[in-house]
Structure formats: C-alpha cells, structure tokens
C-alpha cells in the first residue's frame, strides 16, 4: 500500500537535538527502571494495549538500546515524496528550532509563502508547533488530533 500523506509527531531527526540532560535520562532506560516507569502514562497505555503487558521490562531494554545509538535522518527527510506534516510541542524534547530545521529539509520556511501560497514548500509539506504542550502529552491533545486530521484529509496537495 502506498503512503499518501505522513504525520511525524514529536520525533527528532538527529540525536544531538536532544538536550544533554535528556540524553543522561535516556541512558537510564532499561529493565531496571520498570518500577519507576510504571508510574508513567506510557506504562498505563502499554498495559491497556499490549498483548503481553508482562514484557514491559523487555520493551524498556529495547528502548534504551535504541536511544543510545547516534542517528541523523536528514537524508531520509529530504527524500520524503509524500506530503509530510511535522508536528511538535512548544515544550517538546527538542527545541522548536529543531523542527524548523527539519521543515527546511523539506524546502519549508525558506521564503515568504506568498499571497496565493506560491512560496510554500513543493510537495505539500507543513509544520505545526502546538502551544502549551510537551513531548509527553502532545498525543493527548484535541489540537494535535484536529491539526493532524485536517492535514490528512487535505486533498489539495
């Protein structure tokens, strides 16, 4: 199946966009953090939807391994062919400027959009920085749902 439109939410494109204090916290994510993590909304959701909630410690080990690796998805972002909406919170894990830099990789924010939208990025890409939200509660926001659905339903690009 072809992906017609893409929403990328609260995801950073390169590891050095993450503040050092967050990298230090991420280094502590492993099975040993299970009891602490049981107090988080992430665990509550996992417990409700996972076929095997008892595997939560394994998930934490896998997450810790993944977060320890360096990454830079700049080339992959530049290569996106479908209209892509980058959504972030104004108090996300990476600063808003990071998501602007991601948008620039899609030809966004480089010029005035123009009266008729002629200066918008080719390909129908868009950026939304949502106010009053964080990396952890963005997906719970009605504003996130509305912005994402509006973009996904757009037939003009």
Where are these regions (language model features)?
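Residues at alpha-helix caps and immediate loop-helix transition turns in enzyme cores, especially N-
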Residues: 18-22, 98-99, 140-144
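Short, conserved loop/helix-junction motifs that constitute active-site signature segments
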Residues: 77-81, 106-108, 119-122
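Conserved alpha/beta-hydrolase "acid-adjacent" motif
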Residues: 93-101, 110-113
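Flexible "cap/lid" loop of the alpha/beta hydrolase fold
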Residues: 2-45
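Active-site nucleophile elbow and catalytic-triad environment of alpha/beta-hydrolase enzymes
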Residues: 60-76, 82
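Acidic beta-to-alpha connecting loop that harbors the catalytic carboxylate
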Residues: 63, 90-93, 132-134
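Catalytic active-site module of serine/aspartate enzymes centered on a nucleophile-bearing elbow/loop
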Residues: 112-157
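Short beta-strand/loop motif that positions the catalytic acidic residue
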Residues: 80, 86-88
């Amino acid at each position: 199946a072809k992906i017609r439109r893409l929403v990328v939410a609260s995801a950073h494109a390169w590891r050095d966009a993450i503040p050092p204090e967050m990298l230090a916290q991420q280094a502590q994510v492993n099975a040993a953090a299970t009891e602490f993590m049981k107090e988080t909304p992430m665990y509550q959701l996992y417990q409700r939807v996972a076929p095997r909630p008892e595997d939560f410690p394994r998930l934490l080990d896998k997450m810790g391994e993944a977060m320890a690796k360096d990454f830079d998805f700049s080339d992959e972002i530049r290569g996106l062919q479908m209209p892509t909406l980058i959504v972030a919170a104004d108090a996300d894990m990476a600063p808003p400027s990071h998501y602007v830099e991601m948008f620039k990789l899609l030809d966004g924010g480089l010029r005035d959009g123009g009266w008729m939208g002629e200066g918008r990025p080719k390909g129908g890409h868009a950026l939304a920085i949502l106010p009053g939200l964080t990396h952890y509660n963005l997906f719970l926001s009605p504003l996130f749902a509305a912005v994402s659905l509006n973009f996904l339903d757009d037939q003009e690009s």
